[in-house]
Amino acid sequence: MLTVGMTVRVERSFEIPVDRERVWEFIADPGKRASAISVVQNYTVHDDGSATWRIELPIPVVSQTIGVETEDEERRPPEYVRFVGRSKVMNVVGEHELTETNEGTKVTNTFVVDGSLPGVERFFKRNLDGELDNLEAALVGDVEVDA
């Protein structure tokens, strides 16, 4: 994990014994990605593929649900998606890279959160690794694999 100023960056890889196209079905779906994140209370996926996350952060300076407008910036099916999310308290960039392996698919997730209020960076520094655990568990559950 790297912390620079109010920015936190986490990268994690894991392998799953499922073909890349099936993993892509989950990773490319903005709703499935949002539902795996614990601070996302609800979300709306729009017709253009963008999504609005409504997040609650348990930090003193944020006393309300925050809207985060997300959109995919780059998609290379079935191997890579990069999305960005913007709000008044933080910006987030998520990258998901899928690599075929002999046993299935290697999934590399990178998240960068840039907080613009005190406490946002500390919250994600403590919790971003766990959010990647949640994403992995949601993916494994979605493709019904015993990992």
Regions found by a protein language model. Give the residues of each.
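Beta-strand elements of well-folded, non-transmembrane domains
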Residues: 16-18, 55-59, 74-76, 87-89, ...
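Hydrophobic/aromatic beta-strand elements that line small-molecule binding cavities or substrate pockets
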Residues: 12, 40-41, 67-74, 85, ...
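Glycine-rich portal/gate segments that line the openings of hydrophobic small-molecule binding cavities
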Residues: 44-87, 142-146
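Hydrophobic ligand-binding cavity/cleft-lining segments
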Residues: 1-50
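Hydrophobic pocket/interface hotspot
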Residues: 23-27, 33, 51-53, 72, ...
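Intrinsic-disorder/low-complexity, polar/charged segments enriched in Ser/Thr/Lys/Arg/Asp/Glu/Gln
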Residues: 7-13, 38, 50, 67, ...
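Beta-strand/loop substructures that line and gate deep hydrophobic ligand-binding cavities in soluble
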Residues: 84-137
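A short, structured loop/turn motif at beta-sheet edges
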Residues: 20, 45-48, 73-78, 97-106
